């Protein structure tokens, strides 16, 4: 756990047991500590990440690097500290989407709404985690559309609504960053990895470690996995499950779930 982080170590153990774990790889806490010292991703690490990406493409039979004959490979990028720090650090989902791959994803899945909903979510998460643009900027645009159309839920958004929001979200990114939203998936990934490394030292993470007497010197791992989608329709969903009841400690399964949603919706209580 000190090297792979709690999440990475557990994913590796589950894989070794033959459980159905989405394929991926983990960047170690050692790499995080070096990044925090140097403040730059070094060439050897980038080459190792790209090498593992190519293996992931072969494993999933999808393409991250732009082969239009294959379904796009989208990634989740998650922090994974050795000690559990729930909600303290950052996650990015649907990484790899751009103006080209979103159309390919719509074609390969025959689900245009899903593709554009995933793109909308990705732009918001990336902008918040990497560029540190406040989520409220995106939420205001989302709520404006929902109020105008008299929608009760994000899942009521139409394809046209989603395309409009994507353009609005990109404009927010440009207004804050004075540059266009990055289209290159590889650049997206390296920026995301850096952001997760930096999240080890964000104020809420530091406060949490102080309160729980966790060392500030360990760093976080980064878990990169092939996406599994909970927002593909009414037969898809996402949830959180505990092997014990966290309220009273009873030895019973406990959890909650949402249909046609992604993990952040459950954690954030959006619906």
What does each model-identified segment do?
Residues 1-271:
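Nucleotide/phosphate-binding sheet-loop regions of phosphoryl- and nucleotidyl-transfer enzymes
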């Amino acid at each position: 756990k000190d090297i792979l982080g709690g999440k990475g170590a557990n994913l590796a153990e589950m894989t070794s047991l033959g459980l159905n774990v989405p394929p991926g790889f983990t960047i170690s806490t050692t790499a995080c500590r070096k990044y925090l010292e140097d403040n730059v991703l070094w060439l050897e690490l980038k080459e190792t990440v790209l090498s593992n990406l190519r293996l992931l493409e072969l494993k999933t039979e999808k393409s991250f690097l732009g082969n239009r004959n294959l379904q796009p490979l989208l990634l989740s990028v998650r922090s994974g500290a050795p000690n559990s720090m729930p909600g303290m650090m950052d996650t990015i989902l649907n990484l790899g989407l751009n103006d080209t791959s979103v159309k390919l994803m719509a074609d390969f899945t025959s689900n245009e709404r899903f593709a554009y909903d995933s793109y909308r979510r990705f732009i918001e998460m990336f902008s918040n985690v990497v560029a540190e643009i406040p989520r409220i900027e995106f939420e205001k645009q989302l709520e404006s559309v929902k109020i105008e159309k008299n929608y009760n839920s994000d899942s009521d958004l139409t394809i046209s609504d989603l395309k409009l929001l994507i353009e609005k979200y990109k404009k927010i990114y440009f207004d804050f960053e004075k540059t266009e939203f990055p289209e290159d998936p590889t650049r997206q990934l390296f920026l995301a990895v850096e952001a997760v490394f930096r999240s080890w030292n964000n104020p809420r993470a530091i406060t949490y470690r102080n309160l729980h007497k966790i060392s500030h010197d360990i760093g976080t791992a980064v878990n990169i996995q092939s996406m599994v989608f909970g927002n593909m329709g009414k037969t898809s969903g996402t949830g959180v499950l505990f092997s014990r009841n966290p309220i009273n400690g009873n030895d019973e399964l406990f959890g909650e779930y949402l249909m046609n949603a992604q993990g952040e919706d459950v954690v954030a209580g959006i619906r």
